[in-house]
């Protein structure tokens, strides 16, 4: 008798971009973060979740490359990580998300 592992995710997609967006939205809800943006080093938006301007927040994070900086009334947090020899930036408004569990989820999706 074999036991199948229990699937923890209730929302998933075989499409990479949609899966990244779902992952960001889940992180936003679980971590109580206003907005998340995932960008390239050049600040090009890959995906985002939340009410604020994803492209602008992501571009600021990729440019500043700083753990915390102010943008208007918001504190933004940028965290860089590598996937397939490409550096990406996860920028958040509200609280930092830079732990290995959160980043590992994004890396698994993007490595495919």
What are these regions (language model features)?
Residues 1-112:
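Non-catalytic interaction/Regulatory regions outside core domains
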